[in-house]
Amino acid sequence: MTPEMLYALRDQAGVPSHPVVFLILGVLTFALHIAAVQVMLGAASLTLRGAFSASQHWRRLAAAMITTAKIAVSVAIVIGVAPLLFVQVVYDPFWYTSNVLSAWWVIGFIVLLILGYIAMYAFYWKNHDIVADGGRGGVWMVLSIALLLAVGFIVHSLTNQMLFPEHWMAWYAPQGVVNPDGHSLHYWHLPRFLFFIALSAPVTGAWLYGYRRYLQGGQEADAAYLGWLRGLAQNLMLVGGVVSVL
């Protein structure tokens, strides 16, 4: 891939404002999107942990977190459109090429997202009263988390691929043989991906603080539950923060 080819792929109309504006908006909207993703991962994990526990505190938390996880997926999808559009505005030739190189995964990303959301709702439908009855159908929540993580990994890989135009030709025509099937993901950076996943722990801890504050504002009478929530939130923020840094 030569600079001349990249120039040829540019939109001749240009961008409607200075690129810095779109870069800043892209970072801000991505931060909101990834925060929703991390809340979703944390809430789904807490739901899975708590629904099958004998502890009433854990079960009560699971009942609240399944609702949080469902809403967080919706928020992540809606807000995620904005940074994607900003990426396309600024880096369109790079993003387009990366998508073409892994076209099957671009379509698969949408399918996996839909299936992951359906699996989460399947768990929700099977558990009308987690506090009283405990959890049922845990395999659905495990499947949901796995599929949503796969969705994140696909986007992570596509984003990394667009950063290395010097490798595009080798990926498209390995050893000089053109391979246009789009079946492969060609590049990823696992530590970077795991870093964003690990951040879900401290972010979820902060979310639990907000949840605890919400209960206090509603005159929650169960002081033991509030104290337990505070301890769990502190542990998630402390341990999760250390793991993320390492």
Spans of features found by a protein language model:
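Divalent metal-coordination and catalytic microenvironments
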Residues: 33, 65, 195
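Functionally critical transmembrane alpha-helices in membrane proteins and complexes, commonly lining
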Residues: 29-42, 72
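Juxtamembrane membrane-water interface segments of multi-pass membrane proteins
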Residues: 43-68, 85-97, 123-136, 206-235
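Membrane-interface interhelical loops and short amphipathic "cap" helices
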Residues: 1-30, 57, 61, 85-105, ...
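Membrane-interface helix-loop-helix modules in multi-pass inner-membrane proteins
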Residues: 72-143, 245-246
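Small-residue packing motifs within transmembrane alpha-helices
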Residues: 40, 65-68, 72, 76, ...
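Long, contiguous internal "core" modules enriched in hydrophobic/ aromatic residues
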Residues: 129-246
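Hydrophobic cores of alpha-helical transmembrane segments in multi-pass inner/ER membrane proteins
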Residues: 37-47, 107-124, 194-212
